[in-house]
């Protein structure tokens, strides 16, 4: 979707109703938790969610995970953060060793009782099942509440909000294959970057393919 199309779509009543509904839910959720934070990657989904949340709680804590050597993939981080203005931002530095660490206490304890995250049903079958079964205001076994205000949003609606509000995002999410959360810029233990994505990237953007495989040699095709 280009910006012109997004601005036209933003005038439609169903879209406006969705934005108002989501904003109302965020206000409702904030009134029911004591110490929330926003899990933010500064991609499209989390940028839209963050912008909506800041209208109700400008001082909310924002947690961004930054991986060692990630600057090879992100060269506009400082620019994006500056464009957002004054944020209550906490940057968490991690590395591959942290990813593979299986100790139960590998994550620090915090006083947070809840977090906002930009999960959407449209992203995958697994996400749809999870969000439908657990709901968008869900308390897990550790008593942490997961809040997913964008659950019902489509890619079109996310793009519309982003363009119509001129939201800055990290350029890593503008690279093919990084636009969706299911093809993450940070692989899990089995380094589950899709083989189809790698094969496609290898042929269309060999420089980006080399950067990824240099850092994660075990996923080389």
Predicted regions and their residues:
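Nucleotide-activated chemistry modules centered on ATP-dependent adenylation/adenylyltransferase
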Residues: 1-221
């Amino acid at each position: 979707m280009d910006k012109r199309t997004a601005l036209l779509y933003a005038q439609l009543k169903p879209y406006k109703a969705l934005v108002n509904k989501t904003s109302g839910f965020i206000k409702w959720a904030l009134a029911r938790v004591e110490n929330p934070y926003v899990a933010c990657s500064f991609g499209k989904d989390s940028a839209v969610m963050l912008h909506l949340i800041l209208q109700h709680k400008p001082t909310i804590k924002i947690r961004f995970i930054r991986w060692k050597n990630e600057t090879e993939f992100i060269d506009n981080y400082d620019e994006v953060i500056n464009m957002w203005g004054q944020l209550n931002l906490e940057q968490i530095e991690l590395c591959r060793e942290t990813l593979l660490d299986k100790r139960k206490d590998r994550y620090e304890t915090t006083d947070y009782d809840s977090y906002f995250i930009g999960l959407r049903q449209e992203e995958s079958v697994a996400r749809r099942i999870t969000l439908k079964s657990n709901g968008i205001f869900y308390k897990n076994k550790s008593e942490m509440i997961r809040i997913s205000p964008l659950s019902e949003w489509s890619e079109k609606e996310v793009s519309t909000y982003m363009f119509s509000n001129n939201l800055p995002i990290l350029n890593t999410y503008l690279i093919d294959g990084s636009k969706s959360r299911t093809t993450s810029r940070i692989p899990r233990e089995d380094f589950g970057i899709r083989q189809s994505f790698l094969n496609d990237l290898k042929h269309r953007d060999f420089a980006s393919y080399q950067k990824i495989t240099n850092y994660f040699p075990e996923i080389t095709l």
